Amino acid sequence: MSIEINNESAVEVDEPLIQRLATYALDTLHVHPDAELAIVMVDEGAMEQLHVQWMDEPGPTDVLSFPMDELRPGTEDRPTPAGLLGDIVVCPQVAAEQAVTAGHSTMEEILLLTAHGILHLLGFDHAEPDEEREMFGLQRDILIGFAMSERGR
């Protein structure tokens, strides 16, 4: 798995932890080991520019996903083909604000947003209630499974 993490924000993040979560999520979703993923942390100003440019929405947001090869989750017998999964852009400052509301750490929120972004790259969405149930259920399962795997480290 080629996972590149680039922190362009002023906030320190635990890059090895993000790397482990991304690897866990991609393995869980049976994505080909040669798939490529980029995760970029940006400050609020950069995120606001991206949010306006790509979503036509004002202000910064927490996470944006930019799929490349439109890969979908695989199965144990048939993993996703190798390819460019795409880019996930996370704003740690927005994540910090959301973490306070959610009652957990900023890093936990960044991990949640990373899992959320990966699911979007693999074609999941939450525009409709059924889609939301499926996507958020997978997101929860990934985060719980990852937390359990980290306890065993």
UniProtKB/Swiss-Prot annotation:
Any one GO molecular-function label of the UniProt entry: zinc ion binding
Subcellular location: Cytoplasm
Record's keyword annotation contains Metal-binding: yes
GO biological process: rRNA processing
One Gene Ontology cellular component: cytoplasm
Chief location of this protein within or outside the cell: cytoplasm
Pfam families: YbeY
Xref: SUPFAM superfamilies: Metalloproteases ('zincins'), catalytic domain
Protein's UniProt keywords contain Phosphoprotein: no
Cofactor(s) essential for the protein: Zn(2+)
HAMAP family, alphabetized: Endoribonucl_YbeY (MF_00009)
Its biological purpose: Single strand-specific metallo-endoribonuclease involved in late-stage 70S ribosome quality control and in maturation of the 3' terminus of the 16S rRNA.
Protein name as catalogued: Endoribonuclease YbeY
